[in-house]
Amino acid sequence: DITFAGVQRALPNAPDGYVPTSVSCPASRPTVRSAAKLSTNETSWLEVRRGKTLSALKDFFGHVKVGDYDVGAYLDKHSGNSSSLPNIGIAVSGGGWRALMNGAGAVKAFDSRTDNATATGHLGGLLQSATYISGLSGGSWLLGSIYINNFTTVDKLQTHEAGSVWQFGNSIIEGPDAGGIQLLDSAGYYKDLADAVDGKKKAGFDTTLTDIWGRALSYQMFNASNGGLSYTWSSIADTPEFQDGDYPMPFVVADGRNPGELVIGSNSTVYEFNPWEFGTFDPTIFGFVPLEYLGSKFEGGSLPSNESCIRGFDSAGFVIGTSSSLFNQFLLQINTTSLPSFIKDVFNGILFDLDKSQNDIASYDPNPFYKYNEHSSPYAAQKLLDVVDGGEDGQNVPLHPLIQPERHVDVIFAVDSSADTDYFWPNGTSLVATYERSLNSSGIANGTAFPAVPDQNTFINLGLSTRPSFFGCDSSNQTGPSPLVVYIPNAPYSYHSNISTFQLSTDDAERDNIILNGYEVATMANSTLDDNWTACVACAILSRSFERTGTTLPDICSQCFDRYCWNGTVNSTRPESYDPAFYLADNSMASVSLPTMLSTVVAAGLAMLILV
């Protein structure tokens, strides 16, 4: 039963389901490494992947033209030096199911496997041309669905069969339909959630609400019975297609909570999960641990000889649950709702033994960075590592892995589904947060640079939140090497895609409409709103590469940059409430408006039931 509804699964390689388990250590025992450079795994993989991206770029520029300029000849000329060629990253923001679906629309638009995506006016092949892709919170759910299901397509995830993935009409509260690959009813679903987490706790590991949240997410995101109990994030590195460099390297992003603090600030540590490692380039830790052996008792960067290797801690559901742990807070208000008392009793029984001080975090027990970099790390004395939702520091677009100087990313396509405004539209807050962090006097940015962006009011007043915009076009005006950022904010092209972050259920029609709207946002309605849009995307991709090779940009690129690059103009006047009009025909049944306090409380109360 390898496939269901056309969706393949990855590797269920955890030794004992959700329970982290002692295994024999490899001959070379795992250690924590310095973040001074990329891992040998990543550099070796890049040698393979960059060759694949060259081929993909040639295909992409076969249907995306840059005026009369022969991009294919340019790529051939520099094919012997991969560092001269464009290096592309894609970032998909958080924002719950809204972010998953809007981000899915962009990824669908970028995927050459999507029907008609390589036609004139479309952007199919950009995904295949990318080296890296990152997601946090709702964006991490999208990445998890795609990668754990063997780099499947968004089309195949848009299922219509009961019990299949992405059947969001059944909320996480209800659990999956008993049809299809799932064989359990709601009662069995709740029991499975509790049993999995209880097994981890009995094995001696700290557990929090994030464990149950991550297990619940797995039923919606992974095409496997019982929510893919044995699927790990590190298993991505073991899939032959990834090893062959056939698709981009995925990152899930989360934040650290500083010891003794509850508020996540701009100087918080930003972690990444990649297929091989967990860690950060930030100076607070500046280290990475082998992801496969999370849960092992590292001390001072090594594993003592009397300690076993642990595997299975990096459950794929736990990883994407960690990145979206903000939702934990909405699981705690059940007793303020009018839900039946027997439901509250069951829920509270599950929560009874969980640490009440850690309701909003994921507990990484033991801390893999215990006594590591003791002279500089505030986490070195902590036996447990508190990790939280990747957007809690305001950086809701996961740019951090993509702006690391060692990765040399030229251009980032930043898909922003944030709910910054009263009506749940983005206003650039995430980009502002990343820019301000790069200037933070604490040194937390650790040498990363980011192009200048304006304040949030300017984003709205200049229309930078209603259409794609470019930042960092003039690299000579940067504080350090930084990528050009193509900002793609969620906007209403044909559907009100601004559903609440905490809307827990979405029927297939709304799901598909939001995905279609996201496709239209990324392609500017298949270039019907700008005949030169795909050429302008191409110019953004080529810009840094042309600079390195001393190549003059074609005239059309100058026109594109005049049109899409922020020119430094600021208008900080406080705007009226931001409620953008449709670009295309309205396919919505009704406009999405500001929710009432009652509806927000009801949604929050329902979310609590995820842990029943």
Curated annotation (Swiss-Prot):
Reaction it catalyzes: a 1-acyl-sn-glycero-3-phosphocholine + H2O = sn-glycerol 3-phosphocholine + a fatty acid + H(+)
Pfam families: PLA2_B
Major location category of this protein: secreted
Subcellular localization, as worded in the UniProt entry: Secreted
Gene3D superfamilies the record matches: Cytosolic phospholipase A2 catalytic domain
Superkingdom of origin: Eukaryota
Alphabetical list of SUPFAM superfamilies matching this protein: FabD/lysophospholipase-like (SSF52151)
Record EC number: 3.1.1.5
Organism name: Penicillium chrysogenum
Protein name (record): Lysophospholipase
Glycosylation sites: 41, 81, 116, 150, 223, 267, 306, 335, 427, 440, 446, 477, 498, 526, 532, 567, 571
PTM comment: N-glycosylated.
PLA2c domain residues: 24-571
Function: Catalyzes the release of fatty acids from lysophospholipids.
Enzyme class, UniProt record, top EC level: hydrolase
One Gene Ontology MF term: phospholipase A2 activity
GO cellular component terms, A-Z: cytosol; endoplasmic reticulum; extracellular region
Signal sequence range: 1-9
Membership in a protein family: Belongs to the lysophospholipase family.
Biological-process GO terms, alphabetical: glycerophospholipid catabolic process
Entry keywords, A to Z: Disulfide bond, Glycoprotein, Hydrolase, Lipid degradation, Lipid metabolism, Secreted, Signal
